[in-house]
Every structure is written in C-alpha cells, then in structure tokens.
C-alpha cells in the first residue's frame, strides 16, 4: 500500500528552532509527506518565516485553543495522509530516513500504532544528553506509568481520528492520549 505521512507541528515563538524542524522535515527522503503547522501569534518572526514556506507544508493560524492539545487535534483533522505523527517545533529528525523507515514498518508489520527512539540534545544541539530507547510494548507497563513519548508515535489516521488528545488535561493530555490509543 502506498503510504502518505502527515506530520503535525504546533508553534508559538518557535524561532530559531522551527527552522531546524522544517529543514529536517524537508530533508526526509520519503516523498509522499506533508507538514501541517498550526501557529499562534508570535513575537519572534515565526509568522514571517511561515509565510515563506511552500510545497508540502500547510500553515494554519491557531483559533485560540486552551492548550497545545487543541491545535494538535486541529492539525490531525487537517491531515490527508494515512499515517499521522507529531513533530514539535523545537524537535527535528536525526537523519533523512526517519519517514521512510516509518512507512516501511507500517507496510511490513501491519500495525496501527508505531513508536521509536528519541534523542534529547543540548540547546546547541551538538551533544546528546539523554536517550529514550523504545522497547517491545507491554500493556501492563502503562499502568505503572511507562509510556512512549507522544512525539515518537505514528498512528494510522483512521485510528488517531478516533483517539484525539483531550483538551481537559492541559498537562497530561499526551498521557491520556496514549492510554486511550493503546487500550483499544
């Protein structure tokens, strides 16, 4: 099956990190992709930068949601890909093969949800300060507080639309999202 991957990014005052985020998306060697950016009014030239973006990048203005989970849901609903992932404005892909590997994994495993590793780096992005290494999923680990980071998760669109982020939980909306997603 031909995959298309939609990536959702929410940003407010995201410069200069947003440039690295977008550049890492654009450098992906997987061609059937789109980046959906939802932005809030910023005071750091974010809006001016976004106006210059073209191609597979779609930009929407935030409509005053209570927290970051509302704009994420908005972006997910705008996604046209059959796979959806999240890339925060201050995050970036470590190499050009990430989306290709995601698509291959969906094709070979026939899974609905996929998650992977995350590297945390210093502000200057030159030094890795922490690694979150994925492991085989065990449902019981969720009850113990373990969860894969939501930015490492890719979900089939038909599944994520049924399991959007709850805006009732401004701090733990991502945890609730993961619990709902993995408890189906």
Which functions belong to the PLM regions below?
Residues 130-184:
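Conserved nucleotide-sugar donor-binding catalytic segment
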Residues 23-32:
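Short, acidic, metal-binding catalytic loop of nucleotide-sugar glycosyltransferases
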Residues 62-79:
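Glycine-rich, basic loop-to-helix element that forms the pyrophosphate-binding segment
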Residues 84:
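Short aromatic/hydrophobic "clamp" motif used to bind/position activated sugar donors
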Residues 96-128:
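Conserved donor NDP-sugar-binding/catalytic core segment of glycosyltransferases
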Residues 39-48, 88:
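A conserved acidic beta->alpha catalytic loop
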Residues 1-24:
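N-proximal low-complexity "stem/linker" segments adjacent to membrane-targeting elements
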Residues 33-41, 60-62:
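Short beta-strand/loop segment that forms part of the nucleotide-sugar
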